[in-house]
Amino acid sequence: METLNFQFPAAEPGRGRTLVGCVSSGDLEVLIEPGTAGSLQIQVITSVNGSAARWAQLFQRLFEGRAWPAVNIDIHDFGATPGVVRLRLEQGFEEIAHD
């Protein structure tokens, strides 16, 4: 198990909370909650040791250069592929946009 933390610039706090996905073989769950203005915080708890560079690259592609709401994201990973991670994050942001 490994715990990773990331931070990116953000706009105003998001409005809602959501939980998408579930932790099981090859998947992950993503919890998104309102955060502090100006900061998007991510904590990843993963079963895959030594994966920090992969997570950092994925988040840089997703979060740099766009105005995202200020949220706290908790990810519990059980070996999900980058495509599944992106899908779950997009689902989560879509959910909080409707709150």
Swiss-Prot record:
Protease among keywords: no
GO cellular component, one term: cytoplasm
Pfam families: ACP
Phosphoprotein is among the record's keywords: yes
Protein source organism: Pseudomonas putida (Arthrobacter siderocapsulatus)
Modifications after synthesis and translation: Covalently binds the prosthetic group of malonate decarboxylase.
Keywords: Cytoplasm, Phosphoprotein
Localisation per UniProt entry: Cytoplasm
Function per UniProt: Subunit of malonate decarboxylase, it is an acyl carrier protein to which acetyl and malonyl thioester residues are bound via a 2'-(5''-phosphoribosyl)-3'-dephospho-CoA prosthetic group and turn over during the catalytic mechanism.
Xref: InterPro entries: Mal_deCO2ase/Cit_lyase_ACP (IPR023439), Malonate_deCO2ase_dsu (IPR009662)
Example of a GO MF term: acyl carrier activity
Record protein name field: Malonate decarboxylase acyl carrier protein
Gene name per UniProt: mdcC
Family in the record: Belongs to the MdcC family.
Modified residues (O-(phosphoribosyl dephospho-coenzyme A)serine): S25
Chief localisation class: cytoplasm
Domain of life from the UniProt record: Bacteria
